[in-house]
């Protein structure tokens, strides 16, 4: 709905009444972590952390909520946020089990000054997993990478039905130009970790904004003339529906969010007269 309803500031246009406030599950300090893949053994924790934060400092807090409700801690893990490099098949490889990716911007075989591999992990097999194309959802061990030609060779496998992937003969189960994939079980360059950490921070900020506010329930009665300016003359169709979200601001208890419509009644004779119940719980 294109309007924010503010508690205590109606101007005669609507009445927003508090029906229930539950601060039991409020979180004012949220520890935030990401996934555990592609970090390497030199990363500061087994899971992705917030930018520049060690394990025990990987949290976001809301000072205003702490002042109102005290320090209340919880943890949120975003398993799907991790360093990832999404690549693309740009050309066929030298064999049915190979493909080329001209966008590859680091040498998978690179070693440091001590002769240790920088991106391959000891004891782990690097893999590619496809997200689009005929082999979407399939994961393959990497057999060989040639940085000069940007060719990746994978290890074919045979499933329980005797089907071989990728197929040597059927184009329906082969790599295709434009197919998307990503690496797993490798140590990606730091730029990918930085990107993932920033994404984790953004999602963490969204989460603390939600968790630091109490669970609420409101009753909302809106003036008919106020409704009419939004609905026009389309009185047959309901302007509101259960499951819609309406922006609510209640400064006294720190609420500034969209709250779900859990129920409403509409007068059959006065098409613009609505009584709405808003709540965080269904």
Model-flagged regions — what are they?
Residues 9-282:
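An acidic/polar, Gly/Ser/Thr-rich interaction patch typically located in mid-to-C-terminal regions
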């Amino acid at each position: 709905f294109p309007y924010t309803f503010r508690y205590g500031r109606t101007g005669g246009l609507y009445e927003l009444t508090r029906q229930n406030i539950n601060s039991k599950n409020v979180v004012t300090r949220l520890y935030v972590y990401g996934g555990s893949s592609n970090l390497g053994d030199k990363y500061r924790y087994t899971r992705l952390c917030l930018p520049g934060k060690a394990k025990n400092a990987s949290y976001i807090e809301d000072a205003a909520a702490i002042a109102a409700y005290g320090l209340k801690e919880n943890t949120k893990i975003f398993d799907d946020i991790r360093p990832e490099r999404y690549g693309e098949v740009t050309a066929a490889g030298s064999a049915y089990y190979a493909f080329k990716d001209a966008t590859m911007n680091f040498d998978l075989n690179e070693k440091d000054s001590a002769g240790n591999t920088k991106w391959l992990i000891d004891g782990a097999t690097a893999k590619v997993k496809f997200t689009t194309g005929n082999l979407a959802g399939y994961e393959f061990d990497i057999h060989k990478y040639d940085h000069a030609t940007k060719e990746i060779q994978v290890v074919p496998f045979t499933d329980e039905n005797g089907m071989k992937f990728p197929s040597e003969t059927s184009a329906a189960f082969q790599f295709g130009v434009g197919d998307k994939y990503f690496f797993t079980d490798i140590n990606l360059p730091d730029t990918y970790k930085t990107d993932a950490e920033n994404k984790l921070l953004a999602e963490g900020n969204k989460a603390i904004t939600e968790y630091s506010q109490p669970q609420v329930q409101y009753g909302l009665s809106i003036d008919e003339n106020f409704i009419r300016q939004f609905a026009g003359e389309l009185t047959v169709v309901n302007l509101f529906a259960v499951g819609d979200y309406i922006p609510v601001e209640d400064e006294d208890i720190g609420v500034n969010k969209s709250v779900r419509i859990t129920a409403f009644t509409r007068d059959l004779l006065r098409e613009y007269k609505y009584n709405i119940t808003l709540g965080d719980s269904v």
